A protein has these predicted regions:
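N-terminal secretory signal peptides that target proteins for export/translocation
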Residues: 1-10
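Bacterial N-terminal signal peptides
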Residues: 14-24
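Mature N-terminal, pre-catalytic/accessory segment of carbohydrate-active enzymes
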Residues: 31-59
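Alpha-helix boundary/N-cap detector
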Residues: 35, 215-218, 331
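Aromatic-lined carbohydrate-binding surfaces of glycoside hydrolases
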Residues: 55-218, 224-228, 232-252, 268-270, ...
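Acidic (Asp/Glu)-rich catalytic clusters
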Residues: 75-82, 110-117, 227-228, 258-263, ...
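Substrate-binding cleft of secreted/luminal carbohydrate-active enzymes
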Residues: 126, 268-369
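Short, electropositive alpha-helical surface patch
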Residues: 249-261
């Protein structure tokens, strides 16, 4: 009897142990499965085996030039069939050196040069910088009439990271809209497109009392509408990646979603500045919204500084001159292309002209046929 009772107790212990393990495993799996931040964490793996050359497609491929517009001269893109042209960044103060006096001479020069080779130009209009020593807006805006015009933005370590135009200031937006109208009057229908810079900024109300999340969101939408009114024919786009006060999936206030909805509503294309296929912030915000939406407006994605090695120019550990990283890298261009084409279904890709990656990784992957 004692032996039978002992066996029974042992069997019950074994049963409860197994039952507990099953519950724990099920709970762990359930937690992992239901974690919304993990939803797309493995999406990139589908494209790990992609190889060069990338297949021909309907994507409009452009080469991106930031502060190096002179590099378009004799650039390989001019003789390459798969590249439609150049995306070039121009600052607001490049185009408006003095109040109400517009100078588009450098844009005209670049437009005419590319046109000679049958290539198009896509304008990126800069009002934000990532250099504390440089402001992108005209000096006349840096006055009390426009709330100071610009404010320092800060990185995650609290260090100055560049200057952001006060997009939430009504008077400043009025000046921006006038610039867009002047640009559109001369270039709408001629240039391939024009995009506004990213929506992500490092500004909070504690750093500027005139700032509020809602005022900033409203300002973004007003700029989008002004852009569309100025350029009814050329492609218009905004790099909508993040909005202050929100980080999906945990704090979803509907800010970024509303930008995507509004862009679709008024005909402004949507995109992002960094194709980061393994990072949760990007995967859960701009990339998720591009993937999940059903859009009639064009979508675009940029491969910018650092992206060729899985980083961004804002990463604290990013070193553009890291020779070891350059030599040990894997060419992820086929992966990036596959992800953008299939997962995001983009219309435009903007490949930054960064050495040595563009020459050594991008060019060999695109057949010149």
């Amino acid at each position: 009897m004692k032996s039978a009772l002992r066996k029974f107790k042992l069997s019950m212990k074994a049963f409860f142990l197994c039952f507990t393990l099953i519950i724990l495993c099920t709970s762990a799996n359930s937690q992992e499965w239901n974690n919304p931040a993990e939803k797309y964490k493995d999406a990139y793996k589908k494209y790990l085996n992609a190889t060069c050359p990338v297949p021909k497609d309907n994507i409009q491929h452009f080469v991106y030039f930031a502060r190096d517009r002179e590099s378009i001269i004799n650039h390989p893109l001019l003789q390459h069939a798969m590249f439609k042209g150049a995306q070039i960044m121009y600052s607001w103060k490049d185009f408006e050196p003095e109040k109400g006096i517009y100078d588009f001479s450098i844009l005209k020069e670049d437009y005419e040069y590319l046109k000679k080779y049958g290539k198009k130009i896509f304008v990126q209009l800069q009002d934000v910088t990532f250099n504390p020593k440089y402001k992108a807006i005209p000096d006349y805006l840096l006055t009390g009439e426009y709330g100071g015009g610009a404010i320092l933005q800060y990185n995650d370590e609290g260090k100055p990271d560049g200057w952001i135009a006060k997009r939430w200031n009504k008077k400043l937006r009025e000046r921006f809209a006038l610039l867009l109208l002047a640009l559109g009057k001369e270039f709408d229908g001629k240039i391939e497109g024009i995009n506004l810079q990213e929506t992500a900024i490092g500004v909070r109300q504690k750093t500027d009392s005139s700032f509020s999340e809602q005022a900033y969101l409203n300002g973004l939408k007003e700029n989008m509408l002004a852009l569309k009114k100025a350029f009814p024919s050329s492609t218009t786009m905004i790099y909508a990646n993040f909005v202050p006060g929100e980080m999906m999936p945990w704090t979803d206030k509907g800010y970024l979603r509303s930008i995507y909805q509004y862009g679709e509503q008024i005909g402004v294309g949507l995109g992002g500045p960094d194709l980061m296929v393994t990072r949760k912030p990007q995967l859960n915000n701009p990339l998720a919204l591009m993937h999940e939406g059903n859009y009639t407006v064009p979508l675009g994605i940029a491969i910018q500084d650092g992206n060729y090695t899985g980083k961004t120019g804002a990463d604290l550990d990013y070193n553009e001159d890291d020779e070891k990283e350059k030599k040990s890298r894997k060419n992820i261009v086929p992966l990036l292309h596959g992800f953008a084409k299939d997962f995001l279904k983009v219309t435009y890709m903007f490949w930054v002209n960064q050495d040595p990656y563009f020459k050594e990784d991008v060019m060999p992957c695109f057949l010149n046929e």
